């Protein structure tokens, strides 16, 4: 059974960045559509086109972090509750999402991701 709306396990930007930097084993899932994922996402993220694809790929005992654009985006909240309702035990939501991640100057991937290469003339 899904917990009440107010009872959501979260992860903050610093902890998520540390987990990624250390190479911790967990699944990072962007809860937006494919277009948004292709535009930009946090490195190491996964995107699933369908619920069937998602649930056949994730194991209920895996640690899963879900995110979308910001605290005001409810796609990750809905996915969080869907996973918990299906007995996924280690689920957390990164509420700050892409907006907070990008504002902190952390790396992004995708067609619209800002380039992190040093500026200067091309060789």
Regions found by a protein language model. Give the residues of each.
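Flexible, polar/low-complexity N-terminal or interdomain linker segments that lie immediately upstream
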Residues: 1-36, 110-123
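Short loop/edge segments at beta-strand edges and connector loops
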Residues: 12, 49, 95
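Short active-site oxyanion
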Residues: 22-28, 43-44, 63, 89-90
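A generic "binding-loop/recognition-motif" signal
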Residues: 33, 51, 97
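Acidic/glycine-enriched edge-of-secondary-structure segments
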Residues: 33-46
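Glycine-rich, highly charged phosphate/nucleotide-binding loops
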Residues: 46-53
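Catalytic cysteine-centered active loop of the rhodanese-like fold, especially the PTP/DSP P-loop
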Residues: 55-102
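Short low-complexity, flexible loop/linker segments enriched in glycine and/or proline
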Residues: 105-109
């Amino acid at each position: 059974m899904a917990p009440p709306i107010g009872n959501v396990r979260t992860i903050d930007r610093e902890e998520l960045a540390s987990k990624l930097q250390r190479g911790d084993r967990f699944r990072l899932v962007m809860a937006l559509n494919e277009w948004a994922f292709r535009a930009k996402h946090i490195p190491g993220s996964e995107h699933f086109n369908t619920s069937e694809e998602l649930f056949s790929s994730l194991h209920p005992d895996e640690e899963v972090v879900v995110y979308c654009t910001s605290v005001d985006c409810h796609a990750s909240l809905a996915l969080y509750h869907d996973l918990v309702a299906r007995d996924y035990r280690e689920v957390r939501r990164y509420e700050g999402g892409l907006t907070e991640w990008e504002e902190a100057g952390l790396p992004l991937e995708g067609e619209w991701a800002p380039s992190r290469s040093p500026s200067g003339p091309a060789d």
